[in-house]
Amino acid sequence: MKIVTLFLIVFCFNCCSSGQDSVDKIRKYYTDHTIDNLPSISHGSVSNGSLDHGKLIPYYGSNYSYFDTTSYFSGRAFLHEDVLAFTLKAYKNLENVSNRFYRIMECSNQMGGKLWPHQTHQNGTSIDFMMPLTKDHKPYYNLDEIGLSHYWLSFDDNGKYSEDKSVEIDFEAIAQHILLLNEAANEKGWKLKKVIIKIELKDELYATPSGKKLKAKGIYVVQGLSKMVNALHDDHYHIDFTKV
């Protein structure tokens, strides 16, 4: 937990040191957008849908934070209330198995609908999660701070960063997270409908101890993607959820 605590201290210091990223502004935005207590309703599909009474994810927690203030203040961090609840529970449960810090990326608009440039994310049941990284086999966070530009980072087919091969994807951490998301979702009567990750990275994912468990669970990880979509899912993994 020492790494997580230090990360939060640095995060809060940086927020307080700049106007747009100030903790006060984040807190005010969150407060202003959490007054709707009506139940969430997801309509349609992730690629053609809408969302009633979407709930805003807290910008940061004890071991995670949202990845970009511009995205957050633009209303792109809303979810169906059940998805929000089990996503936060999974982060809480991760504290028992890892001292890593995690980043959540784009979710849905408050009322769903098209979320450019994503093809999905339309009804509050889709989330992008930032790939956790290591450098020289230790947790590495420097690339977590670049905001929306993170979507354009490039990793090779073995999960190594194109600009520095000592930086690589932590596949064990990803598998641990997905397993705990699945467990928390099941408890709420939901399941993971689809996990999207660059196809060439699947072998690396399944080779880890938790990855073997993930494969045994039968959680669907995409079998094929278009060339463009495949190339865009090396810096993050996308998950669609659905009610059982």
Tell me what each language-model feature is:
Residues 96, 109-160:
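Acidic/His-rich structured neighborhood in mature extracellular/periplasmic domains
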Residues 13-22:
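Bacterial Sec-dependent signal peptides at the C-terminal "C-region" and cleavage site
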Residues 99-118, 191, 196-206:
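Acidic helix-start/capping segments at beta-turn-to-alpha-helix junctions
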Residues 23-25, 137-244:
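Catalytic cores and adjacent binding grooves of peptidoglycan-active enzymes
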Residues 98-100, 123-127, 233-237:
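Envelope-exposed proteins and targeting segments
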Residues 103, 126-132, 196, 238-240:
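Soluble periplasmic/extracytoplasmic beta-strand elements of cell-envelope proteins
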Residues 3-13:
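Sec-dependent N-terminal signal peptides
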Residues 35-104, 169-186, 191-192, 196:
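Active-site acidic/histidine clusters and adjacent loop/turn architecture
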